[in-house]
A protein has these predicted regions:
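Acidic/Gly/His-enriched mid-domain segments of enzyme catalytic cores or analogous surface patches
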Residues: 42-133
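A short, charged/proline- and glycine-enriched loop
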Residues: 2-9
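Contiguous, well-ordered alpha-helical segments that form the cores/surfaces of helical PPI scaffolds
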Residues: 9, 19-20, 38-46
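N-terminal active-site wall of soluble small-molecule enzyme domains
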Residues: 16-29, 43
Length: 133
């Protein structure tokens, strides 16, 4: 598996219950492996809670507003291939690790076919070059 941990997985989104969640995470930080959605990321950082992973899927420019604060280098970005490129660039400049995923957008399916099946060497080079997972 990608992550080896005995911790409880906490997937944190921006919800009406987020204040209660923040209290629990602050009281027992060692208990949780935290995956934050992009919409909860800044809020967690404001409370000095550093997620191990932050996930972003949306390619719209407004999504980059969820990443205005300094990015902790230890936080791994899990990004869809259609995610906003400004977010990817910010994590690359920060020398943070990045893992890409495909949520099924039709254009990404074409990209998968071309890149993974026909040009696997290009994909491996891109991962090595940019310190991605």
């Amino acid at each position: 598996s990608l992550f080896h941990t005995d911790k409880t997985l906490a997937i944190i989104g921006a919800s009406p219950n987020l204040d209660n969640t923040i209290s629990e995470l602050k009281e027992n930080p060692e208990k949780y492996f935290i995956i934050a959605t992009d919409t909860s990321f800044q809020i967690l950082l404001q409370h000095k809670i550093i997620p191990q992973v932050v996930a972003t899927l949306d390619g719209q420019v407004i999504s980059s507003r969820h990443f205005l604060q300094k990015i902790p280098r230890s936080t791994i970005l899990l990004a869809d291939f259609c995610a906003n490129p400004n977010i990817i660039e910010k994590f690359l400049k920060n020398k943070s690790k990045i893992a890409f995923t495909n949520t099924g957008h039709p254009l990404v399916s074409l990209f998968d076919l071309w890149l993974f099946q026909k040009n696997n060497k290009i994909w491996n080079w891109a991962i090595d070059r940019h310190n991605c997972l």
